[in-house]
Amino acid sequence: MQFEYKTIEKPVENTLLKEKGSKFIGFAFPVNNEEELKKALEKVRSEHPKATHHCYAFRMGLNGENYRANDDGEPSGSAGLPIYNQLLAHEITNVLVISVRYYGGTKLGVSGLVKAYKESAKITLEEANIITKELETEIEILFNFNQQNIIFTLLSKYDAKIINFDSQEKASILAKIKIKHKDEIVESLTNLQFVEFSFN
């Protein structure tokens, strides 16, 4: 089972490539869902309303199973696909790359466009800081208040992040744990009395 993936740490904006008078302005955004994707696309479109094309590609999901390449009016396969191929080449996911083109008066032809969009995506991703993220899941644990030391020790041993702690007589914790530690945590919790847990 896969426990981690590569993505970019933060957005990269306004990389510039000039090709026969045309300008290609590159952007890369970390995106985790459709909403973030939409926001990033709208942001770039609103910043460049007069651009000739806003071409983009994205990959989302652990194995990049959710993906799209959009030519935005350029000849089919000449823009979105070369951008998408750069995401594959860098082995990253949960990333959107946009290349905004301002037409400069000289036609580049399909092979020229492929080369330019590939290069625009490449220089944009070369500026990004590529990081490895570990997959996480949320766990909610209910336990007797006098067991809190045991629970906190267990979570800290596996590097969990506490999101919320409610210390009633029956205490509850919401925590983020790394999926690679899930089985060990489940085993330890199952061995404790008066403890219930569920995954969100």
What are these regions (language model features)?
Residues A175, H181-E184:
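Terminal, non-globular segments
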Residues I130-F145, A175:
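Short glycine-/aliphatic-rich beta-strand segments at the starts of folded cytosolic domains
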Residues L192-F197:
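Charged, surface-exposed alpha-helical interface/stalk elements
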Residues I141-D159:
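Short amphipathic alpha-helix segments
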Residues F27, H54-Y56, N94-V97, E138:
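Structural motif
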Residues E169-K170:
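N-terminal positively charged helical leader segments and presequences
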Residues M1-S78, N164, S198-N200:
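C-terminal regulatory domains involved in ligand/effector binding and gene-expression control
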Residues A79-E127:
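Active-site beta-strand/loop microenvironment that shapes enzyme catalytic pockets
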